[in-house]
């Protein structure tokens, strides 16, 4: 493992670097009309994970990009996490990745090029695991290290899973534990105990391949990955877009080990507060601990799946085959005009 501490060279970390939802809404308001493309099946109007273009014969091309600054100190692991996170958007749409190209920003006068090579190698290893080539890319001299991928995938048009097509009565599942932002903040602050160093990276480096299997089920009505806006933010996008509201069982939420310890040590990412400031008014009442977990920015987080009862048993069988033990975390119902998300303690 490298002795370089990459997190000391960036002001943010992972998906916690994302611009807050409130500010992003302002940025994306445009006076210029976009091209009206009849083949564009999924664009940015629904705040979805990737774009999808109809290429005929019932097939769609899925296109996405994701990049960020270091969330861990080890360069190779940083590359793995960034690549896993970028490819996840393809799986979240129900697609199969087919090729990736790299995006690299590097402070060439501060960090040796050999360290950047380790980052790229980490990304290449994950691409190999996903069964795709890292086929090229683009690099610039930048004040802080940045790495990510632009990924292209393919999906049957009748298997696309969007984030705004959930239905009242759907059961909610989450495929990875929460708390990634909390533990990586502990690392950046120098408070992470050595025996806990692999808890977050192990989760972040796990590909969301199972999304492609879930997409085969017609009763999976909506799917998205949980990243920088936290569980609350990405569930809110699902609820607002679908015209539903959610009731979550807080005790059922999967959490990384030691999350509460590091919360007690003050390891709350800045992104948590930015997230709550952006959408907290649309959430039901919750205490500080609940807020800090619900709004915790995840990097390479799990899939949030809304499934009808008719496909729930099949979804759980697929998860079991993949070595995942899933439990329901909540349920959706028709929006009643109050808060979109209620958390039951």
From Swiss-Prot:
Q: Which gene encodes it?
A: selD
User: Which Pfam families has this protein been placed in?
Assistant: AIRS, AIRS_C
**Active site located where?**
15
What role does it play?
Synthesizes selenophosphate from selenide and ATP.
Residues bound to ATP are 18, 46-48, 66, 89, 137-139
Q: Transferase among the record's keywords?
A: yes
Which Gene3D superfamilies does the entry link to? PurM-like C-terminal domain, PurM-like, N-terminal domain
Per the record, where is site Important for catalytic activity? 18
Q: Which residues form the signal peptide?
A: none
Q: Name one GO molecular function term.
A: ATP binding
- Keywords for the protein's UniProt record, in alphabetical order: ATP-binding, Kinase, Magnesium, Metal-binding, Nucleotide-binding, Selenium, Transferase
UniProt protein name: Selenide, water dikinase
EC number(s) given by UniProt: 2.7.9.3
Source species of the chain: Aeromonas salmonicida (strain A449)
Gene Ontology CC, one term: cytoplasm
